Amino acid sequence: MTFTVLIPARLASTRLPNKPLADIGGAPMVVRVAQRVLSGAGLAGRVRVVVAGDSPLIIEACQVHGIEAVLTRTDHPSGSDRLAEACDLLRLGDDEIVVNVQGDEPLIDPSLVAAVAGLLLNQPAASMSTAAHAINSEAEFNNRNVVKVVLDAQGLALYFSRAPIPCWRDQPLSANDSAALPSPPPLRHIGLYAYRVGFLRRFPTLAQAPIEITESLEQLRALWHGYRIAVHIAPHAPGPGVDTPEDLERVRHLFGA
């Protein structure tokens, strides 16, 4: 299996300006993300990693460290639009698979990236794939910032929601009691996606779905329009991303340890 990892990177960030270029152990964060993916066991020769940046500064930083990069427009309304442009710039075929890895995840697990790509390759009915892991507390289950997903018998997503789904009508939960969560446990969505390139090119042209707007979840647009999303069940939660200066300091400490 061969696939392409696209890492969208834009300089504008309200909480952490110039985030892709933030130094982590002597290299920009977006470079650390690319290096992390390339370090995955068994991925050598199977994965092409490309940063899709919106500034020449990002492109130059990647090139200095030997990371492939393409310059995309600054006016894209969403990350999906940026990825679609990158696919065109790279002349990728419609049947190829790309994985969207966020540029602020220097601790991403390369095996998770490979698993999501492999799942899509083996699920011909799906247009895209993603991942999830078990929720182990009621507080997490009820948190609106935690996106939940429910699957069908084939491991395809039925729905994503910020609400606690599924709802166990006859089994009330006790506050912060992991033992009260029914089995099998509910699933927390991990924001990692693989796409068939042809679908990724169509996606930005699809009308926004009412449920997408209500939940503020872009992946619901695919379900609304009848496309299927395969879901890989990961054994544990992914490493933390970088959204704030405090997150950045924690990651710097981990790289320096």
Swiss-Prot record:
Q: What is its EC number?
A: 2.7.7.38
Question: Known catalysed reaction(s)?
Answer: 3-deoxy-alpha-D-manno-oct-2-ulosonate + CTP = CMP-3-deoxy-beta-D-manno-octulosonate + diphosphate
- GO cellular component: a single term: cytosol
Pathway involvement?
A: Nucleotide-sugar biosynthesis; CMP-3-deoxy-D-manno-octulosonate biosynthesis; CMP-3-deoxy-D-manno-octulosonate from 3-deoxy-D-manno-octulosonate and CTP: step 1/1; Bacterial outer membrane biogenesis; lipopolysaccharide biosynthesis
> Which keywords annotate this record?
Cytoplasm, Lipopolysaccharide biosynthesis, Nucleotidyltransferase, Transferase
Q: Which InterPro entries match?
A: Cytidylyl_trans, KdsB, Nucleotide-diphossugar_trans
BP terms from Gene Ontology:
CMP-keto-3-deoxy-D-manno-octulosonic acid biosynthetic process; lipopolysaccharide biosynthetic process
Recorded hits in SUPFAM superfamilies, A to Z, give: Nucleotide-diphospho-sugar transferases
One of the record's GO molecular function terms: 3-deoxy-manno-octulosonate cytidylyltransferase activity
Which Pfam families does this one have? CTP_transf_3 (PF02348)
Presence of keyword Flavoprotein: no
Compartments reported by the entry:
Cytoplasm
Which leading EC class covers this enzyme?
Answer: transferase
Fetch the PANTHER family from UniProt.
3-DEOXY-MANNO-OCTULOSONATE CYTIDYLYLTRANSFERASE, 3-DEOXY-MANNO-OCTULOSONATE CYTIDYLYLTRANSFERASE, MITOCHONDRIAL
Q: Which NCBIfam families does the entry mention?
A: kdsB (TIGR00466), PRK05450.1-5 (NF003952), PRK13368.1 (NF009905)
Protein role:
Activates KDO (a required 8-carbon sugar) for incorporation into bacterial lipopolysaccharide in Gram-negative bacteria.
Q: Which family does it belong to?
A: Belongs to the KdsB family.
Quote the protein name from its UniProt record: 3-deoxy-manno-octulosonate cytidylyltransferase
Q: Which organism is it from?
A: Albidiferax ferrireducens (strain ATCC BAA-621 / DSM 15236 / T118)
Q: Which gene encodes it?
A: kdsB
